[in-house]
């Protein structure tokens, strides 16, 4: 506020020497102070006051219990502040005044009380022999905020009358008063005005929680009066023990001590008492070259709970491409004095870029064609052939080949049929060959399928022909008795023949499928005979349908869905892998819109959630896949899922805002998502999140299209305007104020602690008001906006609106055109034209105007619209009558000579009787990469000229609010 300094020039009093220096530029000590030589007398502080642990007391609390202790004071050894006049022996007078702790010291409004104290000043005599002066019973009286200006003005007046450092502590132009000594004198009107202005200015900046002691010694002159002033000395700062910024900073607990290098992860931190607008969370790392990296946690005053808990988001690490964890430190830091807490360790770990493990699965070794064949001879061919691991027709010594192990079907004498390797070259999925094992996730209706006669042995005895594929162990034959051996040989022979017949039937079935494929070229001929194997899962729990989607084989997905349609389809299309991902989840994650449509067509279930509780709507909104989200929202089951929270308590609309996806947000709003739904952690709505992320595009979309409740509250009563004010966002504060936000709504956070209340007398004890957006205003611009001052942004050359030729249309032509656009036909009215002209996002605002078509034309003119584009839009609508009206205007000379109507002449009905549109057309987010229609559409609003005129003003709010500020602003926000 230095620009408002009334002492910046001498014009106020029309004197050449008056007020030539600002009080902000006053030096700590005046250059005309005498007796400031190395050999002469000087004042020295022997014992500094104790900086922390002493409480400032209010008048109603009575005197302090014990005086201000010295810095070295201990429980059993008390000490107090002391000064000494050096190089001098004789009578002297020492005064003590309270001064501020800023760079430039000024008188403080608090008062010293105790023995030898009067009017807030302590006066003690020294000498004639002992030149050490102690102050054993000093107390500090805390003035209330309401009386700061009054007390400070009286204190400055007293200092000027007595000559107690007025040039140093009041204003440099009053330095000459010290020469008059301590005698009473009358102040001139000019001097009184200087004092009043100085008191007013210093009141705004005064910190009531900290003071310093200024010691000044006066030596007697030739007349015996104490007028010879020694150079004053100033003590260390003394902090009120009840003030938040007086306590020692300390981190008590954090719920996390590690986070990703990309930052943005939420952490809950418990601490000793802090001041919500004077605290930072600092991350730092000391580098080997001596440098220091630092980053600061992201939070606003609304994220500080009762001065003891902070919820913040971690900063991004200096290098997001690290390959191993990096150790840093985190600490609390006070903004005002840069005091820090003891640092705590924090670990940054590398970014997990493949949280869904899609890339990992894609990078696995792809199967080679040669891997499907063994190295031996015959049908078995060494481990990869049709009949398992045998090396040739009768081989029995080969080891099991790779691929899926097929169950034995109750034949213990034979190894499982080893199929060729799958896409992952794994042996998992169907359980490996063990006695009487079953399929993993085997379909319940598999026995009813066409393969039942192959998979189940017949009741009748089957005689096998040809040699047995497997032989009994010779070791067993040697040990068993002869009769037992014969019986066993018969059983084995029976089982050999039975198994061989079934294996040959299976081979014939696959051979026929291969012939059919050769004739038709349709891969579904091969897939059909293996359709029951689609339920097999690999070591990650993925089925063939999961893998086909992961590897982007869209046509294969369609083929699999076709051959498995029917009784086993539901089990396959909704099967989850080990990450609880269904094929539909993976199709959304891999951005395959066509596959999503195919899965939905065959009945994929939208309601299934992944391991984090995310539905497919959450996943699409998180990745910003608006096309896929649109496909999902068309499903009949989407309406039941659209407001479902995930494991973090976030709805899809919350995630769309957090992902900065305007298109997804618009789709969700249009589909009926609950705009005012609260996330389940703290009760924030989508509008709270948009303000928290400083995203005016999304905030405008929620207000204009979603009709969001502008004064919606969190669990602690915080509104979006609280957040905007606390973060100092002028644009969002102006937008919310224009939408009708109430700057006087109190949240549940006490404005102050009852013990620290500014004034107990005259107030109802125990009743503490909540905090309003006005109380939280981080700067004067936000404060003024909340008090009704119009928002005035600084425009750059890029902000200049384009110029069109719509103004060439005469008033009569525009009125005729507007009349044609007011017809109820949905294909030819103003709403359809707005969509064609790119202004459809403002249709909700247009409807609130008494003449929507006229408002539309005014907006189109402001946006730089052209007649050519207007005619083309009308042509697309097939509105020949409207086109003829425009063409006729240019055929009539009299009409073209008419003066065009201006936007300021247009009659616009206000949406609210008091709150203005507040330059919504100026609220462009120059840093945004997407356009909500709020950046460009707010530019296109024709409200800007009406804002500067005398006509009615447009606003977004529905409830009238009128707030103002009477008188000058005093005090610090």
From Swiss-Prot:
InterPro entries: Ankyrin_rpt (IPR002110), Ankyrin_rpt-contain_sf (IPR036770), DEATH-like_dom_sf (IPR011029), Death_dom (IPR000488), Ig-like_fold (IPR013783), Ig_E-set (IPR014756), IPT_dom (IPR002909), IPT_NFkappaB (IPR033926)
GO aspect biological process, one term: negative regulation of DNA-templated transcription
Region (Interaction with CFLAR): 435-973
UniProt KW Transcription keyword: yes
Residues with site note (Cleavage (when cotranslationally processed)): 433-434
UniProt entry keywords in alphabetical sequence: Acetylation, Activator, ANK repeat, Apoptosis, Cytoplasm, DNA-binding, Hydroxylation, Isopeptide bond, Lipoprotein, Nucleus, Phosphoprotein, Repeat, S-nitrosylation, Transcription, Transcription regulation, Ubl conjugation
Ranges where the record places region Disordered: 434-467
GO cellular component: chromatin; cytoplasm; cytosol; I-kappaB/NF-kappaB complex; NF-kappaB p50/p65 complex; nucleus; protein-containing complex; transcription regulator complex
Phosphothreonine, modified sites: 948
Domain observations: The C-terminus of p105 might be involved in cytoplasmic retention, inhibition of DNA-binding, and transcription activation. Glycine-rich region (GRR) is a critical element in the generation of p50 (Nuclear factor NF-kappa-B p50 subunit) by acting as a proteasomal 'stop signal', which leads to limited proteasomal degradation of the C-terminus, while generating p50.
Protein name (database record): Nuclear factor NF-kappa-B p105 subunit
Source species: Rattus norvegicus (Rat)
Gene coding for it: Nfkb1
């Amino acid at each position: 506020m230095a620009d408002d300094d009334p002492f910046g020039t001498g014009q106020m009093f029309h004197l050449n020497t008056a007020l030539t220096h600002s009080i902000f530029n006053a030096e700590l000590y005046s250059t005309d102070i005498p007796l400031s030589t190395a050999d002469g007398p000087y004042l020295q502080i022997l014992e500094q006051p104790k900086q922390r642990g002493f409480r400032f007391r209010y008048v109603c609390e009575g005197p302090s219990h014990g005086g201000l202790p010295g810095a070295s004071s201990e429980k059993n050894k008390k000490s107090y502040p002391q000064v000494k006049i050096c190089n001098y022996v004789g009578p002297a007078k020492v005064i003590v005044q309270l001064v501020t702790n800023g760079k430039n010291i000024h008188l403080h409004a608090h008062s010293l009380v105790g023995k030898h104290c009067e009017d807030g000043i302590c006066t003690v005599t020294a000498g004639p022999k002992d030149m050490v002066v102690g102050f054993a019973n000093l107390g500090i009286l805390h003035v209330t905020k309401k009386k700061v200006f009054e007390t400070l003005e009286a204190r400055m007046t007293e200092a000027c009358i007595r000559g107690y450092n007025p040039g140093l502590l009041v204003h440099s132009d009053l330095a000459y008063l010290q020469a008059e000594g301590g005698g009473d004198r009358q102040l001139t009107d000019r001097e009184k005005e200087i004092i009043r202005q100085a008191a007013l200015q210093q009141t705004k900046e005064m910190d009531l929680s900290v003071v310093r002691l200024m010691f000044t010694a006066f030596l007697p002159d030739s007349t015996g009066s104490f007028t010879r002033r020694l150079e004053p000395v100033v003590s260390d700062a003394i902090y009120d023990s009840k003030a938040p910024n007086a306590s020692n900073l300390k981190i008590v607990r954090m719920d996390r001590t590690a986070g990703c290098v990309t930052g943005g992860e939420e952490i809950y931190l418990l601490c000793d008492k802090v001041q919500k607008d004077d605290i930072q969370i600092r991350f730092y790392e000391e580098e080997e070259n001596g440098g220091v990296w630092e980053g600061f946690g992201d939070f606003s005053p609304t994220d500080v709970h009762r001065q003891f808990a902070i919820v913040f988001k971690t900063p991004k690490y200096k290098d997001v491409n690290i390959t191993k964890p990096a150790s840093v430190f985190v600490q609390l830091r006070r903004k005002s004095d840069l005091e820090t807490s003891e640092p705590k360790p924090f670990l940054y770990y590398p970014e997990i870029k493949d949280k869904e493990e899609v890339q990992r699965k894609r990078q696995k070794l792809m199967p080679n064609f040669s891997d499907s064949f063994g190295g031996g001879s015959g049908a078995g061919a060494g481990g990869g052939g049709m009949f398992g691991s045998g090396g040739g027709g009768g081989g029995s010594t080969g080891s099991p080949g790779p691929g899926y192990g097929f169950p034995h079907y109750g034949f213990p004498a034979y190894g499982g049929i080893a199929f060729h390797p799958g896409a992952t070259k794994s042996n998992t999925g169907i359980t490996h060959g063990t006695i009487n094992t079953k399929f993993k996730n085997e379909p319940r209706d598999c026995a009813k399928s066409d393969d039942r006669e192959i998979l189940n042995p017949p009741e009748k005895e089957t005689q096998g022909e040809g040699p047995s594929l497997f032989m009994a162990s010779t070791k067993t034959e040697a040990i068993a008795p002869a009769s037992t051996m014969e019986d066993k040989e018969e059983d084995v022979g029976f089982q050999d023949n039975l198994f061989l017949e079934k294996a040959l039937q299976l081979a014939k079935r696959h051979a026929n499928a291969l012939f059919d494929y050769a004739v038709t070229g349709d891969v579904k001929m091969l897939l059909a005979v293996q359709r029951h194997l689609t339920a097999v899962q690999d070591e990650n729990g993925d089925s063939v349908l999961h893998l086909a989607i992961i590897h982007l084989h869209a046509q294969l997905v369609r083929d699999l869905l076709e051959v498995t349609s029917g009784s086993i389809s539901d089990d396959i299309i909704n099967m989850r892998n080990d990450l609880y991902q269904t094929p539909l989840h993976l199709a959304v994650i891999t951005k395959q819109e066509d596959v999503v449509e195919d899965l939905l067509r065959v009945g994929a279930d939208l309601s299934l959630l992944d391991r984090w509780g995310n539905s497919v709507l959450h996943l699409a909104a998180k990745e910003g896949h608006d096309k896929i989200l649109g496909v999902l929202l068309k499903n009949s089951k989407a309406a039941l899922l659209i407001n479902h929270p995930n494991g973090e308590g976030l709805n899809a609309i919350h995630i769309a805002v957090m992902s900065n996806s305007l298109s997804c947000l618009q789709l969700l709003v249009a589909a009926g998502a609950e705009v005012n739904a609260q996330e389940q952690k703290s009760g924030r709505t989508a509008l709270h999140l948009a303000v928290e992320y400083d995203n005016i595009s999304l905030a405008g979309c929620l207000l204009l299209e979603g009709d969001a409740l502008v004064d919606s509250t969190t669990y602690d009563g915080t509104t979006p305007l609280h957040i905007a004010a606390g973060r100092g966002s002028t644009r969002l504060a102006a937008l919310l104020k224009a939408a009708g936000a109430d700057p006087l709504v109190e949240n549940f956070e006490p404005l102050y602690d009852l013990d620290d209340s500014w004034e107990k007398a005259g107030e109802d004890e125990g009743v503490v008001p909540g905090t309003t957006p006005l109380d939280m205003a981080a700067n004067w611009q936000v404060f003024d906006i909340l008090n009704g001052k119009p928002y005035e942004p600084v425009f750059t050359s890029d902000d200049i609106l384009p110029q069109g030729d719509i103004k060439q249309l005469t008033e009569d032509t525009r009125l005729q055109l507007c009349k044609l656009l007011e017809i109820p036909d949905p294909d030819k009215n103003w709403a359809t034209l707005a969509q064609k002209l790119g202004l459809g996002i403002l249709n909700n605002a247009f409807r609130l105007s008494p003449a929507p078509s006229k408002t539309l034309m005014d907006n189109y003119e402001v946006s730089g619209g052209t007649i050519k584009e207007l005619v083309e839009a009308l042509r697309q609508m097939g509105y020949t009558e409207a086109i003829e009206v425009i063409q006729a205007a240019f055929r009539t000379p009299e009409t073209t000579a008419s003066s065009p109507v201006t936007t300021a002449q247009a009659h616009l009905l206000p949406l609210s009787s008091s709150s203005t549109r507040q330059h919504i057309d100026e609220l462009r987010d120059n840093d945004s990469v997407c356009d909500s229609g709020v950046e460009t559409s707010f530019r296109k609003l024709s409200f800007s000229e009406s804002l500067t005129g005398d006509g009615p003003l447009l606003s977004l709010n529905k409830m009238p609010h009128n707030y103002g500020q009477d008188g000058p602003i005093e005090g610090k926000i």
